[in-house]
Design a protein with these regions (language model features):
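Short, acidic, metal-binding catalytic loop of nucleotide-sugar glycosyltransferases
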Residues: 20-33
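Short, polar loop motifs at secondary-structure junctions
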Residues: 35-44, 81-83, 105
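Residues at the starts of beta-strands that form the adenosine-phosphate
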Residues: 3-5, 32-34, 75
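Conserved catalytic core of nucleotide-sugar-dependent glycosyltransferases
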Residues: 90-216
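Short acidic, S/G/P-rich loop/turn micro-motifs used as interaction or catalytic elements
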Residues: 11-16, 83-85, 134-136
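N-proximal low-complexity "stem/linker" segments adjacent to membrane-targeting elements
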Residues: 1-21
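GT-A fold catalytic core of metal-dependent nucleotide-sugar glycosyltransferases
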Residues: 68-103
Length: 217
C-alpha cells in the first residue's frame, strides 16, 4: 500500500512471546506497507524512533506527531502493541478532511474467563487518517494544550479546538484489542474493567477466545 504508512507504538511492556506473535500478525496484515516503529527500546524492524518520555495519553499523541512528520505518504494508520490487526482493516481511506475509525473491534481481557466483547466507541488504535490533517490537528492541540490529556483526534473532547469530521467503517473481520495490567487505563490495571454487553466465545477469523489469549505470554 504505497499511499499509507503504519505508525506502530509500543513502550515494550508487553510479554516477549506476545511481542513476537503480534509482530508476525501485523506484518502479515500490512504486507509491503512502510512502517515506522516508535518504542522505548531499540527495535530492528521498520524505521525505528526511540521515545524516552513517561507513558501517558499526551505522550501517545506526541509520538504520533513525530511519526506523521517523518512519514511521506498521504495517509497514516496507527498500530498499537496490544491490538491485533487484519489486512482488510488497512484498506479504508477517509476523505482528506476526515478521520477514519474502524468500529469493528472486539475486546479480550488477559484475566478471567476468556470472552470476546464489543463496545461501540472509537479508539486511537483503530485510526486511519490523512497525514497532513493529523499534523495540523496535533500542532494546534499542543500549541494550546501542551500538557492536557486529550483523547481521539477529530473529537478533541474538553477543548475549544476545532472539531474535524470523523467516519466509522466496518470491515467484515473484527480487530482485537487486549486489556492488560500494563495499560494506561486504571480499570485495566486494577482488573475492574467491565465488558460490553455483546459477548462471544468464538468469532470468525480469530477463532476461540480461550485459544487466542494463550498468545499473551
Amino acid at each position: 500500500m504505497s499511499d499509507l504508512t503504519i505508525i506502530f507504538l509500543t513502550v515494550n511492556k508487553v510479554p516477549d512471546a506476545w511481542a513476537e506473535y503480534h509482530k508476525s500478525v501485523l506484518l502479515a496484515a500490512i504486507g509491503d506497507t512502510p512502517i515506522i516503529t516508535i518504542s522505548r527500546e531499540p527495535m530492528d524492524w521498520g524505521l525505528n524512533l526511540i521515545q524516552s518520555e513517561e507513558p501517558s495519553v499526551n505522550n501517545i499523541y506526541r509520538q504520533i506527531l513525530r511519526g506523521a512528520k517523518l512519514a511521506t505518504t498521504p495517509y497514516i494508520a496507527i498500530a498499537e502493541d496490544d491490538t491485533l490487526y487484519h489486512a482488510d482493516h488497512f484498506k479504508f481511506r477517509p476523505p482528506l478532511d476526515t478521520y477514519g475509525y474502524d468500529m469493528h473491534r472486539w475486546g479480550l481481557f488477559t484475566w478471567g474467563k476468556p470472552t470476546f466483547y464489543y463496545k461501540d466507541r472509537i479508539s486511537n488504535a483503530a485510526m486511519i487518517a490523512p497525514r497532513e490533517l493529523v499534523i495540523k490537528s496535533l500542532e494546534e492541540r499542543f500549541a494550546k494544550y501542551p500538557d492536557t490529556q486529550i483523547g481521539e483526534l477529530g473529537k478533541e473532547k474538553g477543548t475549544t479546538l476545532d472539531r474535524h469530521n470523523t467516519v466509522g467503517y466496518w470491515p467484515d473481520t473484527g480487530m482485537i484489542f487486549f486489556s492488560h495490567v500494563n495499560s494506561l487505563d486504571p480499570t485495566e490495571q486494577h482488573k475492574s474493567k467491565k465488558m460490553g454487553t455483546v459477548q462471544a466465545y468464538e468469532i470468525p477469523y480469530w477463532g476461540r477466545a480461550e485459544n487466542l489469549v494463550q498468545n499473551w505470554k
